[in-house]
Structure formats: structure tokens, C-alpha cells
Amino acid sequence: MSPDLNCISSSLLRSEPCINSLIAILTVCGQQLFSSYTFSCPCQVGKNFYYGSAFLVVPALILLIAGYALRGQMWTVASEYCCCSCTPPYRRSSPLERRLACLMFFDITGRALVAPLTWLTVTLLTGTYYECAASEFASVDQYPMFANVTPSKREEMLAGFPCYTSAPSDVIPIRDEVALLHRYQSQMLGWILVVLATIALLLSKCLARCCSPLTSLQHHYWTNHLHNERVLFEKAAEEHSQLLIRHRIKKVFGFVPGSEDIKHIRIPSCQDWREISVPNLLCVGDTSQGPYSFLGDRVVEENEEDRQEGIEMKP
């Protein structure tokens, strides 16, 4: 891929409107496939409401949780700016850092709400789930044919409306009117949700920027700084960890995997195996340097090979 295409794709992936649009499109496609292959109203009294409501709300909750869980920034906020009483003193953040964390959390929430709001909007505008959930609660007192029907029989007939493929001629107009009413109500709720979500998004953006300690240019710089810091840190951490692990492995075994000229190997002692079997935590407390590794810090002396038994590798 050419550098120009790489630059364009990178800028698109970092563009919030493009990512939000992509999430919304994928959610719409997933909702249509989900409805086509999995949803079938039970058309039974007492089950329609729970079944339709579950298909309407539960996927939205799952998408919301996934939206939070899949954002790396969410775990950064949780680990770096945690204000719990159990947080060690050296990890407690300042008021300014907490305000920046709140600003970051607003951004994360805005992105996480795209998929569930899209799901709810599309399902309400389609009306299938709502029609199933509300079928047994329809008001049909104005129709003469229901005047002499017992309440239990009426509930059974109403619950079966979403599944009627063939019905008596006097029931078909009533069923169509009830279905039309439910779709109208569902679509009205969908448009109300769109309006409320738009207003809430605008207000949250304004509130976040108003309460932010950063100006517009500072916020832009800070966002780019966090992104570049994360990218460079991951590259440096990967290279550093590989070099450190190779150094530790050489101290334990006397050679590094991939070496062409191996003349000496070291046999780890029982104490070495006991120590490298216990995981060590990174920089806990006020220690100046953490062990970083399962391999520990025991085998660090320059003359370790002279004191431990080894095997010379003949060429």
C-alpha cells in the first residue's frame, strides 16, 4: 500500500464521524440479519411481551457493554485514574487528572452509545419487535365482534395477531388496524429516540468542552499526543521486552534461541526453577525497579556461569 493510502486510511480510522458511521452501518446490517434468521414471535399469552422486549433491549445492552469493553481508553481510565479507596497512594490522581479522565470518559461513552442507539432506532422504526411485545395489550373495545368474547379468549386472539397468516374475514381488518397502530407507535418512539439522542449528544459535547480544563487547540493536541504516545510506547515496549527476555533467558540457560554458535549452555538449579515458577508483579510499592518477568532477578551475576555447572558445546 502506498504512503498516501496509508495516510488516508490512518486518518479515516482516527476520524470519529467515519468510525461512528461505520459502527452504525454494521449495526443496521447485523440487526437485519438477526431479525431475519432468529426472531419469531411466539404468539402466546404472557410470552409475547417478554420475547419482544428481550429482542429489543438485550442486544442493545450487549452492544453497550461491548462498546465500553472494546475501547482501550476505557481500561486506561479505569487503571490510571481510579479513585477507589483501595487504590495505592502512589497511583492516586490529582483533581486535574480526574477532570481529564472525565473528559475522556465522555468521549468513550459517546462512541459506546452509537451501536445500541442505532439498534434501538432501527428496531423501533421497523416495528417488528414492538408489534410482538404490544400485541396482547391492544385496545379492541371499539370492535363489536369482541363484545361477547371472554377476557381470556380475547387475550389469546390478540396474542395470535402477529402470527395470523389466514384468519376469518371479520378478523383481518381488525388485525391490520392493530398492526398499523403498533407500527405507528413504534416508529414514533424511534423518531423520539433519535431526537433525544441527538440533543443528549450535543449537550454532552458542549458540557464536556465547557468543563474541560483544555482549550480547543489544547484538546486537539492532547488527543494526538495520547494516540502517538500509545503507538510509540507499544513499539518500544515490544522491543524492550524482547531484549530483556533474551538477556534473562541467556542468564538462565546460557544461550539465546536462534544463536548459531552455541559453545556453552547452563543447567538451571532447582532454586532457579522454583523462583521462575512464581510470577512477579511489576513495580509494586515504592521499589525502584521491578523484576518484570517470570524469570526473576536471581541469575544476574556476571560470574554466575563460573559457579554453576554447565556444559561446553563443542563445534
Swiss-Prot record:
Cystine pairs annotated here are: C41-C132, C43-C163
Q: Which residues lie toward the Extracellular compartment?
A: 38-48, 131-184
Compartment list: Cell membrane
Q: Name one GO cellular component term.
A: plasma membrane
The primary location reported for this protein is membrane
Q: Does the keyword Signal apply?
A: no
Name listed for the protein in its UniProt record? Calcium homeostasis modulator protein 4
- Native organism: Mus musculus (Mouse)
Gene responsible for this protein? Calhm4
